[in-house]
């Protein structure tokens, strides 16, 4: 019935695409007219569009002509013309949707269309990429189009100064990474001066690889933290206890929730081994350490979730297989893993500011994104972000053939079948890409292929393999190439049939330039950094100095041909010119990588050396292309790239990303998944039924089975996992929404304090409220006056407002009514405040205004930090209330709101108290050694560490 209805109504996505066709027709009809314009006339269109916006026209009114202008500019500047389907992609992005575009369909070029159109408003467009290299490349490469048309283009990179970032954020179009954007948002909300704020209000955002950022990273909070000392011996002893405890006897493991639960026997055993009577004793708490130690033992597996490098535990991203140096698991988990591995335990951190990507990107009034795979997560994008997904048709039809899955009884049988399939394809000469889910499994398959004598390349998170990433990817599409990769998702690299001549030319430059220009490892603080290729540049390369360094490619016969004598001579000349300009072995390796990257891209440059490098690069590429293009034709004839999946991922989207490596831009290709009943997915989510079926039919371990029941079991398992993780992300989102409302309130208040020229009105309001609180605490109007605590009230007022010690007496209040007492004390406090201000003016005119801002910010920041910890503790505590038939989320909302109100009251009270009691002290500073300004919040996030106001130092009496 449903299928019949769908046939009658048609695919809703096709209907959506049809709506855009008339606009595409209109844009195409403008092409000849726009092409006839001179460069100056084309640039003048930007001014014309802005004037039309000022006159009341909308962006939608301008869209056809603006898109035609961008298409023409791209033709002139980049020699690239937007296809019709790319125009549709641009419209989808402009409307605040997600455009699903297959690998190799030119997402980067598509983004120029909505970026230009929305950039005309002057309110700012952010184009967000997953790593710094891509942000820089796109700002230089695609930025040419925008600069040609008169828009300003900014780039935000890690390590830039706040001033450089501010300039970039003020541009019409800004390229940045998701993490830097988030951290800058947090830093802005820790600034102690409005001049330190870098970002302006968010307007429109285009996210590249939107599924990676909004779904895979959704549960990862961005955290700015300060270090807190914690006893490392507790982690070590807890690790010893965890080694003694036995699974299923002392604790149970919930693989789905990635959690451990201690049994009664487990609690007793842990208490006995530690020699304590109660793991939860507040004076000597052990429960947290023991739970984390058991989690580290059972749920965090070496070479799957992390690797140990240079005596450090480094996280491996489960989606991309990349190492994430600098990232640490929070809440003491990282320390527990360090204790388990016997490496030095680093100190814990206290959260100073935090936000999740979910809430960060929901701050944009208009949000859009691009990815190769979003359809499977359509429901989540809709419910969480209110984003529609539109699948953009490919420019050429997809020719990839996806074979049905083969399922084996045991893992051993599966790996044997995978090895045989590789041997079969290799014998035909077809390139093969094998996706594995962990370092350990990739090495197991590698060992099997070595035994069979099949040459292959291994790409996983191990440093020695990571450094060869560009080299491995460059030849993954060559005839007979076999590549084993851990999670190809997010590697951001197209595998080109016949070999990637661009990469090969880049590596040839690198091979010759690095030994001459790069500092030797002993002097190179950056250690070894891998080739910065597409998708590279984030967290690769070891940091330990190596005794000897070589930049020569490892693979024999890597280069498709010997270079001609003329090109070799040009290469020698450019290397000599580079040494003359920069000196022998004087540059950090990363700087040389940048030189090569800029030379091999199309961004405009003035530097004569880079222009010479670019000329040599193009000559090398042209010679290699003669061979790779011929090989491309041969590989196409053989059937293209064959992709083998060795396990179903928890998300169908990641499987689709692996499959999508084959059949790019209309090339042929094929894919097949090999699975076993011992795979994690089937083991955790319902492989028992299938296992019983196999036992019943006595299926051998090396015999694959295909059965409708099996296919439906697999799909159900993946759907269950997707729903499970969606529910988890939804739960995180619902809880974080509570924090988000509070965060928005406190950050808005903080911004008002930063921007407020005169905070006196706010402070006097605080004074009146605080006096009212003190009066209510000691005077109850419903009781007779003889029961009022006038003496305590007087003492408390004198404590809060020291200037009243001389003027306020108990007898002043004796015969007054409640209202009269309140009015009298408020008036006295206001007079005391005026007197305090006059006193401070004798030190420096306007000092009270600076003091008001200083103490307000100090209290907001200090109490917000404490509040974050309280909310984290509350979140853990309410989880247990579900057993008492209470909704934990409602409890969290209600109690969190109470905590928030209490924090706001404390900010008010503490600020009033501090302003009344502090006394400035004149600090004699010799002119010659005048101190540098206090660091910004980004460098020193704790405003309580600020060194004072001018030469005054805030001290309590």
Curated annotation (Swiss-Prot):
Residue ranges, compositional bias (Low complexity): 929-947
Molecular function GO terms recorded: ATP binding; protein-exporting ATPase activity
Membrane topology: Peripheral membrane protein
Reactions this protein catalyses: ATP + H2O + cellular proteinSide 1 = ADP + phosphate + cellular proteinSide 2
A GO CC term attached to the entry: cell envelope Sec protein transport complex
Residues that span the membrane, as ranges: none
Residues given in the record as ATP binding sites: 86, 104-108, 494
A Pfam short name: SecA_SW
Intracellular or extracellular location(s): Cell inner membrane; Cellular thylakoid membrane; Cytoplasm
Family annotation (SMART domains): SecA_DEAD, SecA_PP_bind
Biological role stated in the UniProt entry: Part of the Sec protein translocase complex. Interacts with the SecYEG preprotein conducting channel. Has a central role in coupling the hydrolysis of ATP to the transfer of proteins into and across the cell membrane, serving as an ATP-driven molecular motor driving the stepwise translocation of polypeptide chains across the membrane. Probably participates in protein translocation into and across both the cytoplasmic and thylakoid membranes in cyanobacterial cells.
Record PANTHER family: CHLOROPLAST PROTEIN-TRANSPORTING ATPASE, SECA INNER MEMBRANE COMPONENT OF SEC PROTEIN SECRETION SYSTEM
Subunit: Monomer and homodimer. Part of the essential Sec protein translocation apparatus which comprises SecA, SecYEG and auxiliary proteins SecDF. Other proteins may also be involved.
Family: Belongs to the SecA family.
Protein name: Protein translocase subunit SecA
Species for this entry: Synechococcus sp. (strain JA-2-3B'a(2-13)) (Cyanobacteria bacterium Yellowstone B-Prime)
């Amino acid at each position: 019935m449903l299928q019949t209805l769908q046939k009658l109504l048609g695919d809703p996505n096709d209907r959506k695409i049809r709506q855009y066709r008339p606009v595409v027709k209109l844009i195409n009809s403008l092409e000849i007219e726009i092409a006839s314009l001179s460069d100056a006339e084309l640039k003048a269109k930007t001014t014309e569009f802005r004037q039309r916006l000022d006159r009341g026209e909308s962006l939608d009114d301008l869209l056809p002509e603006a898109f035609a202008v961008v298409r023409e500019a791209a033709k002139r500047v980049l020699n690239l013309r937007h296809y019709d389907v790319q125009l549709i992609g641009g419209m989808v992005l402009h409307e605040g949707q997600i455009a699903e575009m297959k690998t190799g369909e030119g997402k980067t070029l598509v983004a120029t269309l909505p970026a230009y159109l929305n950039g005309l408003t002057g309110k700012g467009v952010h184009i967000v990429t997953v790593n710094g290299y891509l942000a820089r490349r796109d700002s230089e490469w695609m930025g040419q189009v925008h600069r040609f048309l008169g828009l300003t283009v900014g780039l935000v990179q890690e390590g830039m100064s706040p001033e450089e970032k501010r300039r970039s954020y003020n541009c019409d179009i800004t390229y940045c990474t998701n993490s830097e954007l988030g951290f800058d948002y947090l830093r802005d909300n820790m600034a102690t001066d409005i001049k330190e704020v870098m970002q302006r209000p968010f307007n429109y955002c285009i996210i590249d690889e939107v599924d990676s950022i909004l779904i895979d990273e959704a549960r990862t909070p961005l955290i700015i933290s300060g270090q807190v000392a914690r006893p490392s011996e507790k982690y070590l002893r807890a690790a010893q206890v965890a080694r003694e405890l036995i699974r299923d006897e002392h604790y149970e493991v919930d693989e789905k929730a990635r959690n451990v639960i201690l049994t009664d026997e487990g609690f007793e055993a842990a208490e006995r081994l530690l020699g304590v009577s109660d793991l939860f004793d507040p004076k000597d708490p052990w429960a947290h350490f023991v739970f984390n130690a058991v989690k580290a033992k059972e749920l965090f597996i070496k070479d799957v979730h992390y690797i140990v490098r240079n005596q450090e535990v480094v996280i491996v991203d489960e989606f991309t297989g990349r190492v994430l140096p600098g990232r640490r698991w929070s809440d003491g988990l990282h320390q527990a893993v360090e204790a388990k591995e016997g490496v030095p335990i680093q100190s814990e951190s206290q959260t100073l500011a935090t936000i999740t990507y979910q809430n960060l990107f929901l701050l944009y009034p208009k949000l859009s994104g691009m990815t190769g795979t979003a359809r499977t997560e359509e429901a989540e994008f809709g419910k969480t972000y209110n984003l529609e997904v539109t699948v953009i048709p490919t420019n050429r039809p997809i020719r990839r053939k996806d074979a049905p899955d083969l399922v084996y009884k045991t893992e051993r049988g599966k790996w044997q079948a995978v090895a045989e399939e590789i041997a079969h394809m290799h014998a035909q000469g077809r390139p093969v890409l094998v996706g594995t889910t962990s370092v350990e499994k990739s090495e197991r398959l590698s060992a099997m292929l070595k035994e069979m004598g099949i040459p292959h390349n291994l790409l996983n998170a191990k440093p020695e393999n990571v450094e060869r990433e560009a080299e491995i990817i460059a030849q993954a599409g060559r005839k007979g190439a076999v590549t084993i990769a851990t999670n190809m998702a997010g590697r951001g690299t197209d595998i080109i049939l016949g070999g990637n001549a661009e990469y090969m030319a880049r590596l040839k430059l690198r091979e010759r330039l690095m030994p001459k220009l790069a500092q030797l490892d002993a002097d190179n603080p950056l250690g070894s950094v891998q080739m910065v290729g597409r998708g590279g540049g984030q967290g690769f390369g070891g940091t330990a100095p190596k005794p000897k360094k070589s930049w020569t490619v490892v693979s024999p016969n890597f280069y498709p041909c010997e270079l001609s004598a003329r090109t070799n001579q040009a290469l020698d000349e450019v290397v000599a010119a580079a040494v003359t300009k920069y000196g022998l072995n004087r540059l950090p390796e990363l700087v040389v990588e940048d030189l090569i990257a800029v030379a091999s891209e199309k961004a405009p440059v003035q530097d004569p050396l880079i222009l010479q490098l670019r000329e040599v690069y193009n000559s090398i590429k042209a010679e290699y292309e003669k061979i790779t293009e011929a090989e491309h034709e041969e590989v196409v004839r053989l059937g293209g790239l064959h992709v083998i999946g060795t396990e179903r991922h928890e998300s169908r989207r990641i499987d689709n990303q692996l499959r999508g490596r084959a059949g790019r831009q209309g090339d042929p290709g094929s894919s097949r998944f090999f699975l076993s009943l011992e795979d994690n997915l089937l083991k955790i989510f319902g492989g028992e039924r299938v296992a019983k079926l196999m036992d019943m039919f006595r299926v051998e371990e090396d015999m694959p089975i295909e059965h409708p029941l099996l296919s439906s079991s697999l799909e159900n398992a993946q759907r269950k996992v997707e729903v499970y993780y969606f529910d988890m992300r939804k739960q995180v989102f619902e809880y974080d929404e509570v924090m988000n409302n509070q965060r928005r309130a406190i950050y808005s208040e903080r911004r008002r304090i930063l921007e407020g020229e005169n905070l006196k009105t706010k402070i006097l309001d605080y004074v009146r409220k605080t006096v009212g609180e003190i009066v209510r605490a000691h005077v109850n109007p419903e009781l007779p006056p003889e029961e009022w605590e006038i003496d305590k009230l007087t003492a408390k007022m004198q404590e809060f407002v020291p200037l009243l010690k001389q003027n306020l007496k108990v007898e002043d209040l004796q015969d007054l009514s409640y209202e009269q007492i309140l009015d009298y004390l408020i008036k006295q406090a206001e007079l005391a405040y005026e007197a305090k201000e006059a006193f401070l003016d004798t030190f420096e005119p306007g000092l009270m205004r600076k003091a008001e801002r200083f103490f307000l910010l100090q209290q907001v920041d200090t109490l917000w930090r404490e509040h974050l910890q309280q909310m984290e503790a509350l979140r853990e505590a309410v989880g247990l209330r579900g057993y008492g038939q209470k909704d934990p989320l409602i409890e969290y909302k209600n109690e969190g709101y109470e905590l928030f109100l209490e924090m706001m009251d404390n900010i008010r009270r503490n600020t009033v108290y501090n302003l009344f009691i502090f006394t400035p002290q004149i600090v004699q500073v010799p002119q010659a050694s005048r101190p540098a300004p206090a660091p910004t919040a980004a460098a020193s996030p704790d405003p309580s560490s600020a060194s004072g106001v001018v030469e005054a130092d805030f001290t309590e009496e």
